[in-house]
C-alpha cells in the first residue's frame, strides 16, 4: 500500500495493426524480457493462423475467446476469528480482462510442441469454441465460488 495515495493506472495504447487495446494487452502478456517486437510477431502470426484455420476475422475470434474465458466470480481468502474462509466475490471488469488474457497465454505456453504462434492460435480457437485449458480454468473458478456460496455474507 503506497503511502503517497492512490497510484494512477497506466493507459495502454492500442496496437498498430488492429487498433485494439485488448490485442495490445495480449502482446504485453506474451512479451518476455522486454522483447516487444518478438511478442508482436508471435501475436500477429497467431492471428494469421486463426484467419487461415477458421476463415473468420481473427479479432472476432479473439473477442469471442475472451468472453468465454473471462471469469464473473472468484474466491478471495478472508480471515474470520482464526479461520480462513474462501469468500466468493464478483470480479471487476479490468481484472476480468487481465485474468482472461493471462489464462489464455498461460495455457497456450503449457501446450506441447510447436511454436508459440501455433500454440497461442490453437488456445484462442479452442477458447472461442468453449474448450481448452483456459475455459476449464474459468469453470473451475466458478465451481469454487459456487461451492463457497455459504460464505458470501463475509464480503467486504
Swiss-Prot record:
Quote the cellular component terms of the Gene Ontology held in the record: small ribosomal subunit
Q: Which UniProt keywords apply?
A: Ribonucleoprotein, Ribosomal protein, RNA-binding, rRNA-binding, tRNA-binding
Q: Which GO molecular-function terms appear in the entry? A: rRNA binding; structural constituent of ribosome; tRNA binding
The record's disulfide annotation reads none
**One biological process GO term for this chain?**
translation
User: What binding partners and quaternary form does the record give?
Assistant: Part of the 30S ribosomal subunit. Contacts proteins S9 and S11.
NCBIfam families, alphabetically?
rpsG_bact
Q: Which PANTHER family does the entry mention?
A: RIBOSOMAL PROTEIN S7 (PTHR11205)
Similarity annotation: Belongs to the universal ribosomal protein uS7 family.
Function, as annotated:
One of the primary rRNA binding proteins, it binds directly to 16S rRNA where it nucleates assembly of the head domain of the 30S subunit. Is located at the subunit interface close to the decoding center, probably blocks exit of the E-site tRNA.
Q: Any idea what this protein is called? A: Small ribosomal subunit protein uS7
Instruction: State which gene encodes it.
Output: rpsG
Amino acid at each position: 500500500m503506497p503511502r503517497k495515495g492512490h497510484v494512477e493506472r497506466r493507459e495502454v495504447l492500442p496496437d498498430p495493426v488492429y487498433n485494439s487495446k485488448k490485442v495490445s494487452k495480449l502482446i504485453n502478456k506474451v512479451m518476455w524480457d522486454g522483447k516487444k517486437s518478438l511478442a508482436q510477431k508471435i501475436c500477429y502470426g497467431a492471428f494469421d493462423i486463426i484467419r487461415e484455420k477458421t476463415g473468420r476475422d481473427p479479432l472476432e475470434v479473439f473477442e469471442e475467446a475472451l468472453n468465454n474465458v473471462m471469469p464473473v466470480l472468484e474466491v478471495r481468502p478472508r480471515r474470520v476469528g482464526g479461520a480462513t474462509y474462501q469468500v466468493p466475490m464478483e470480479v471487476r471488469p479490468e481484472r476480468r480482462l487481465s485474468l482472461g488474457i493471462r489464462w489464455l497465454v498461460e495455457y497456450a505456453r503449457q501446450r506441447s510442441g510447436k511454436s508459440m504462434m501455433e500454440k497461442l492460435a490453437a488456445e484462442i480457437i479452442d477458447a472461442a469454441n468453449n474448450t481448452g485449458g483456459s475455459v476449464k480454468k474459468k469453470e473451475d473458478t466458478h465451481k469454487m465460488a459456487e461451492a463457497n456460496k455459504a460464505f458470501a455474507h463475509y464480503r467486504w
